[in-house]
């Protein structure tokens, strides 16, 4: 599980 903040960071890192 990941928190909204972590998920957001992962999405940005994906790019």
From Swiss-Prot:
- Ranges where the Peptidase M12B domain occurs: 14-15
User: GO cellular-component terms in the record?
Assistant: extracellular region
What cystine linkages occur within this chain? none
PTM notes: Contains 16 disulfide bonds.
Q: In which tissues is it expressed?
A: Expressed by the venom gland.
Cofactor(s) it depends on: Zn(2+)
Function according to Swiss-Prot or TrEMBL: Snake venom metalloproteinase that impairs hemostasis in the envenomed animal.
Recorded family membership: Belongs to the venom metalloproteinase (M12B) family. P-III subfamily. P-IIIa sub-subfamily.
Q: What is this protein called?
A: Zinc metalloproteinase-disintegrin-like
Source organism of this protein record: Micrurus corallinus (Brazilian coral snake)
Q: What is the lineage of its organism?
A: Eukaryota, Metazoa, Chordata, Craniata, Vertebrata
């Amino acid at each position: 599980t990941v928190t909204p903040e972590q998920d957001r960071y992962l999405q940005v890192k994906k790019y």
